[in-house]
C-alpha cells in the first residue's frame, strides 16, 4: 500500500505533476496493491465565506482563493506562505485512469461515510 496522507497531493500544482506522481505510484505498486489519499472537496460556499478572512486556528493565517487556478493561497501572520491546488472528483478519477489504476472505494469522510453533496473530504482507495 502507498498512502499519501494529509492532503499532500494538493501540493502538486499541475495536471502533469499529478499524472507523473500517479504513474510512479502505479509502477511502484505490486499487482493488486492499494493506493490511498485524501483531498478536500472544494465548496464554493465555504471558500466565499472565508476568502480573505483572518483565522487563528490551527495557526494565525488568512486564506485567499483563486477559483480560476483551483488554488488557495495561505498566508501566515508570521509571513510564511503556501498554496494548495484542489481537483474535482472527476479529475482524480481521470488520474487513476491514465495511470492504469482502478477505483476500489471513494468515501466522503474518514469514517467511511458515503460521498454526497455535503461531503467536505474525498477519501480515495485505488488498486493496481
Predicted regions and their residues:
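A short glycine-rich, Lys/Arg-flanked "PGG" loop and its adjoining helix->strand segment in the class I
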Residues: 17-34
Amino acid at each position: 500500500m502507498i498512502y499519501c496522507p494529509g492532503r499532500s497531493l494538493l501540493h502538486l500544482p499541475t495536471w502533469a505533476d499529478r499524472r507523473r506522481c500517479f504513474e510512479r505510484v502505479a509502477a511502484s505498486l505490486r499487482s493488486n496493491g492499494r493506493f490511498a489519499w485524501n483531498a478536500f472537496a472544494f465548496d464554493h460556499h465555504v471558500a466565499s465565506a472565508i476568502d480573505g478572512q483572518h483565522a487563528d486556528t490551527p495557526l494565525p493565517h488568512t486564506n485567499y482563493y483563486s477559483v480560476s487556478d483551483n488554488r488557495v493561497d495561505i498566508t501566515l501572520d508570521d509571513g510564511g506562505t503556501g498554496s494548495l491546488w484542489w481537483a474535482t472528483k472527476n479529475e482524480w478519477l481521470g488520474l487513476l485512469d491514465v495511470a492504469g489504476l482502478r477505483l476500489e472505494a471513494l468515501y466522503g469522510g474518514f469514517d467511511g461515510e458515503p460521498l454526497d453533496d455535503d461531503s467536505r473530504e474525498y477519501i480515495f482507495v485505488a488498486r493496481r
